[in-house]
Amino acid sequence: MDIKLKDFEGPLDLLLHLVSQYKVDIYEVPIVEVIEQYLNYIETLQVMKLEVAGDYMLMASQLMLIKSRRLLPKVVEHIEEEDLEQDLLEKIEEYSRFKTVSQALAKQHDQRAKWYSKPKQELIFEDAILQEDKTVMDLFLAFSNIMAAKRAVLKNNHTVIERDDYKIEDMMASIKQRLEKENVISLSAIFEECQTLNEVISIFLASLELIKLHVVFVEQFSNFGAIILRKEKK
């Protein structure tokens, strides 16, 4: 099965998405948490063998520098550190304004296209909605946090032998069988039983496919929070 994940328009688009989840002013977000979310996302893409563009990696190195300085004991005020953070937040704010204008122009484009018979050029800004307000990217960002924790656990297990022959179809059947018995399960609980990262990835992709097909239903009560699967819609 090919993995096709809607990407962001660039590193600032990803950062804006993460910042917007906190529902506060850009300058009031917990910057270290945002940086950790970004780094988890990039690491998960790498584990899943998805291509990561160079500008994402460059931003990751800059964010790691900000994070490391944030976590150092503050014996002396680091003016350079504050400048790095301020510069980053200003770039996110500027990108937010740019994206708002771009979306407004896209809407106007859609309206004008109704008056012409030729097909309009499609403009895409967001990834597909799976169920209600949950998108593929919402679930993937939550999944990237789980993957970060699972990687840490598996690093201490030197007896695990990786295998790459997990079939998405088999995982889908396994999830459906489990829901027949339990009605409600969390992905975290399933992942705890996994022995390899390949198994974790296969289960996540199987879950996405089941959600897309409306075979199972998904709940997430907080941003980046636990992913709950249900047999029936509430």
From Swiss-Prot:
UniProt keyword annotations, A-Z: Cell cycle, Cell division, Chromosome partition, Cytoplasm
GO process annotations (BP): cell division; chromosome segregation; DNA replication
Biological function: Participates in chromosomal partition during cell division. May act via the formation of a condensin-like complex containing Smc and ScpB that pull DNA away from mid-cell into both cell halves.
Pfam families recorded: SMC_ScpA
Subunit structure: Component of a cohesin-like complex composed of ScpA, ScpB and the Smc homodimer, in which ScpA and ScpB bind to the head domain of Smc. The presence of the three proteins is required for the association of the complex with DNA.
Annotated source species: Streptococcus pyogenes serotype M18 (strain MGAS8232)
Lineage: Bacteria, Bacillati, Bacillota, Bacilli, Lactobacillales
Keyword Lipid metabolism set for record: no
GO CC field: cytoplasm
Family of the protein in this entry: Belongs to the ScpA family.
Signal peptide start and end residues: none
Domain of life: Bacteria
Gene3D superfamilies documented for this protein: 6.10.250.2410
Descriptive protein name: Segregation and condensation protein A
Subcellular localization: Cytoplasm
